[in-house]
A protein has these predicted regions:
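Long, non-catalytic terminal segments
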Residues: 1-2, 23
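Bacterial N-terminal signal peptides
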Residues: 2-13
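Flexible, solvent-exposed loop/hinge segments and secondary-structure transition points
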Residues: 17-160
Length: 160
């Protein structure tokens, strides 16, 4: 009887522990480097000097690439776009458009660190957001989006 009670208690303890565990995918540094380099290269090919920042799931900077000739403002813009996208798990263009249509979302831009302009996109491994990329410096947000999307397309086979 005592052995069965101990076995039941141990099994229950293992089950309780398993309920509290969470396994998360994280972005490797090599992937962050590749994303930032690909975004800058895509924009350079189009004649835009940009900065690309890649953040982890918590919005902390993993990597930043700044093209020769990119303005100093692009550093903060790309970082804030990446942070916004990682935090909200959405692309910043969609957030900007939503805030323009939805009065309840208009103050999202007041959150510290947020920048709701095009150029920020989440990086997903399957359905899980593992970080985000932010691009700043092209003449318009939709052009920053294109460079970020080109970088994501380049690595999409490894994000399943």
């Amino acid at each position: 009887m005592t052995i069965m009670m101990v076995a039941a208690l141990l099994a229950g303890a293992g089950l309780a522990q398993a309920q509290w565990e969470r396994i998360e995918k994280n972005m490797p540094l090599a992937l962050a480097e590749e994303l930032a380099a690909a975004a800058v290269a895509d924009c350079q090919a189009k004649g835009y000097a940009v900065t690309a920042t890649v953040v982890d799931r918590a919005g902390l900077v993993k990597v930043m690439h700044r093209a020769d000739g990119a303005g100093p403002h692009t550093i903060d813009a790309s970082r804030r776009k990446a942070y916004t996208s990682a935090s909200a798990r959405n692309n910043t263009t969609a957030m900007m458009e939503n805030s323009q249509k939805n009065p309840g979302a208009q103050n999202l831009g007041q959150i510290d660190g947020f920048l709701m302009l095009g150029g920020g996109m989440p990086v997903r491994a399957g359905n899980e957001v593992i970080g985000a990329i932010g691009v700043g410096g092209a003449p318009a947000g939709h052009l920053d989006d294109q460079c970020a999307q080109a970088a994501l397309d380049k690595v999409k086979d490894r994000l399943k």
